[in-house]
Curated annotation (Swiss-Prot):
This is Nucleoid-associated protein Exig_0019. Transmembrane segments: none annotated. Homodimer. Residues 1-16 have a biased composition (Low complexity). It is found in: Cytoplasm, Nucleoid. Keywords: Cytoplasm, DNA-binding. Pfam families: YbaB_DNA_bd (PF02575). Residues 1-23 are annotated as: Disordered. The lineage of its organism: Bacteria, Bacillati, Bacillota, Bacilli, Bacillales.
Amino acid sequence: MRGMGNMNNMMKQMQKMQKDMAKAQEELKDLTVTGTAGGEMVSVVADGHKNIIDVIIKEEVVDPDDVEMIQDLVLAATNDALKKVDELVSSKMGKFTQGMNMPGMF
């Protein structure tokens, strides 16, 4: 029956890990990152769930004759923000998958 004690202990550890992971995922929604482009002329703010919260475009970058440049800067800032979210999620959630071979999880 010794194996049952180990199994119960393992189940308790798994339940605790699931609870801790859910808490960490909940905390991510309250964290924000800012991606920038064009020397911070365009900024995009995203939360830890990859929701875009804000887009800031400085007035001096607005040129009605070059809308494509603004589009490129917004795209670059958005990609920068999303990359930072991925890094944030990896640092926050990586401890749960450390030592496990689960590619692409976090």
